[in-house]
From Swiss-Prot:
One of its GO terms (biological process) is aspartyl-tRNA aminoacylation. Aspartyl-tRNA synthetase with relaxed tRNA specificity since it is able to aspartylate not only its cognate tRNA(Asp) but also tRNA(Asn). Reaction proceeds in two steps: L-aspartate is first activated by ATP to form Asp-AMP and then transferred to the acceptor end of tRNA(Asp/Asn). It is found in: Cytoplasm. Residues 199-202 are annotated as: Aspartate. L-aspartate binds at E175, R221, H447, R488. The gene is aspS. GO terms for molecular function: aspartate-tRNA ligase activity; aspartate-tRNA(Asn) ligase activity; ATP binding; nucleic acid binding. The lineage of its organism: Bacteria, Pseudomonadati, Dictyoglomota, Dictyoglomia, Dictyoglomales. This is Aspartate--tRNA(Asp/Asn) ligase. It is an enzyme of class 6 (ligase). It comes from Dictyoglomus thermophilum (strain ATCC 35947 / DSM 3960 / H-6-12).
Length: 593
């Protein structure tokens, strides 16, 4: 029985036609001596009517069917009786008068109800992923993902980009997250790594003269997982030669503008807002601020610098700051102030100073230390109005802004502050090129070692590297970092200088990155690019709570696949072939003894 149509495609124009359909039994109803079957495939649902007067054999078969059985049918399209139409589905004006049914495959009783409105245990969903993927939401997510990636490809091809695949088996360069490593059978004792990104290859492609490259790249990182992380993930990887930062911004902004309009009929405004890393931290306490909330950080260091409080004096002596958040039209209760205070302490802060402006008077947890001049300055500078409140904390700059950045979102939840609807894109620029890692006690790259310093800061590489700003940028959407990019270093001497600051010896640099350094000696053009997380973008656009809801076959937070059982042990022969001997941790060894 050869299929002629998809279930969801049939409409009133097909009345009178004979059709052949295949799909899953979505629902069965017996009514008035007839059997009604909702038949489902990827395109939608159509109603079948099985009448014994037309085909007793088909009726007998239909009487044995169960939900999720796979069947094929032949029949005639007819208009539904008046008053029996279903406007909720595209096929609601018609039904199929069944003449023949063929059972392709029965189904066992389902381990969970695919169509329940109740939340389904994710462990069960992942174990029976082939069933979970039949659900409307999952089908919609995966199909939207396909359409989004197709739209990206079309847009970039029209703008002169060439899609080029880069290798999955590469040399290990353990900077940043851990690599997944793969033993070589042909080269005993040597290993490949799976790429954390195609970074080095896309730079090589610019040296090769391809000018504009892109790839829907699979990337791999062996790191501890969270709700927004997967060990294998997909990114839109791009690189362009002879560009400035604004050229890259322009391409990405128009990519989103075109794609969102075509796929979702959403209009977005370009160019996206731009703020520096320092502005983002000072205003929002985060380098990926959620602009849907208006809560901003205010600096009151200057106002409070003469307060006779020991902790303020000692904070300012150490070049600390005093910053806080205004709560417009909110006067917290004692309990609510206590919740905020406890959260600050939980985040390793030293407590809060709070202020409320009610009945024309500024009340505060430190009222006895405030003179009228200080109160008036606070009211005027913060533009406090009747019914407003303010709280602040003192400490080292980075500590204070990070605490307030976390509190900003928790306060929005505590006081039910509504977030604005829509997509709020933002470029964050001018990150530091380096940061000091307290645990490792060394300077590390803020993004990666191939990011170019700003031209005016190049002299600081020799004198004060922690003050060097980078030609890099992050794209943020609704508080989620979609990806990072930068103008790259394309001169060997600057790249070597950066490696030296990062304590990568010339020997290590040659071993790990020698091919790139050598390529720079053969006419490397200025170039830059970006990588955007496809999984994260799709999760936001489909309003999904987890990346696992937009990936067909995701891993759990422990990095396992509940469907296939990966990772698994392998037999000893396979290990011998790649010259590997497994040394178990002590606990595992004891279990096996």
């Amino acid at each position: 029985m050869r299929r002629t149509h998809y279930c969801g495609e049939i409409n009133i124009k097909n009345v009178g036609e004979k059709v052949s359909l295949s799909g899953w039994v979505h629902r069965i109803r017996h009514h008035g001596g007839l059997i009604f079957i909702d038949l489902r495939d990827r395109s939608g649902i159509v109603q079948l009517v099985v009448d014994p007067a037309i085909s007793q054999e088909s009726y007998n078969i239909a009487d044995t069917l169960g939900n999720e059985w796979v069947i094929s049918v032949e029949g005639k399209v007819r208009k539904r009786p008046e008053g029996m139409e279903n406007p909720k589905i595209p096929t609601g004006e018609i039904e199929i008068e069944v003449e023949k049914i063929n059972i392709e495959n029965p189904s066992k009783p389902l381990p969970f109800n695919l169509w329940s409105n109740k939340e389904i245990d994710e462990t069960v969903r992942l174990k029976y992923r082939y069933l979970d993927l039949r659900r409307d939401k999952m089908q919609s997510n995966i199909i939207f993902r396909h359409n989004f990636i197709l739209a990206i490809r079309n847009f970039l091809a029209q703008n002169g980009f060439i899609e080029i695949e880069t290798p999955y088996l590469i040399v290990s360069t353990p900077e940043g997250a851990r690599d997944f490593i793969i033993p070589s059978r042909l080269q005993p004792g040597k290993f490949y790594a799976l790429p954390q990104s195609p970074q080095l290859f896309k730079q090589i492609l610019m040296v090769s003269g391809f000018d504009r490259y892109f790839q829907i790249a699979r990337c791999f990182r062996d790191e501890d997982l969270r709700a927004d992380r997967q060990p294998e993930f997909t990114q839109l990887d791009m690189e362009m030669s002879f560009v400035e930062i604004e050229d890259i911004f322009n391409i990405i902004e128009n990519l989103f503008k075109t794609t969102l309009k075509n796929l979702m009929n959403i209009d977005i405004t370009v160019p996206f807002p731009r703020i520096t890393y320092e502005e983002a931290m000072n205003t929002y306490g985060s380098d990926k601020p959620d602009l849907r909330y208006d809560l901003k950080i205010s600096d009151v260091t200057e106002i409070f610098k003469n307060l006779p409080l020991e902790f303020i004096r000692s904070t300012l002596e150490k070049n600390g700051v005093i910053k806080g958040i205004i709560l417009k039209n909110i006067v917290p209760s004692r309990r609510e102030w206590s919740i905020i205070e406890n959260k600050v302490r939980e985040l390793k802060g030293k407590g809060i100073m709070w202020f409320t402006y009610t009945d024309g008077e500024l009340k505060s947890s430190i009222s006895k230390y405030l003179d009228e001049n200080t109160k008036n300055k606070l009211i005027e500078n913060l533009n406090l109005r009747e019914g407003d409140s303010f709280f602040c904390i003192a400490g080292e700059w980075k500590e204070v802004v990070k605490i307030l950045g976390t509190l900003r979102l928790e306060i929005a939840e505590l006081f039910n502050i509504e977030k604005k609807e829509g997509l709020y894109f933002l470029w964050v620029t001018d990150f530091p090129l380096f940061e000091y890692d307290e645990e490792e006690r060394r300077i590390v790259a803020e993004h990666h070692p191939f990011t170019s310093p700003k031209d005016e800061d190049i002299p600081l590489l020799d004198t004060d590297p922690l003050k060097v700003k980078a030609k890099c940028y992050d794209l943020v959407l609704n508080g989620t970092e979609l990806g990072s990019g930068s103008i790259r270093i394309h001169k060997k001497e600057i790249q070597e200088k950066v490696f030296n600051i990062l304590n990568i010896t010339p020997e290590d640099a040659k071993k790990k990155f020698g091919f790139l350094l050598e390529a720079f000696e053969y006419g490397a053009p200025p170039h830059g690019g970006i990588a955007l997380g496809i999984d994260r973008i799709i999760a936001i656009l489909t309003k999904s709570n987890s990346l696992r809801d937009v990936i067909a076959f995701p891993k759990t937070q422990s990095g396992t696949c509940l469907l296939t059982g990966a990772p698994s042990e392998v037999d000893s022969k396979q290990l011998e072939e790649v010259h590997i001997r497994v040394v178990y941790p002590e606990e595992k060894r004891k279990e096996e003894e």
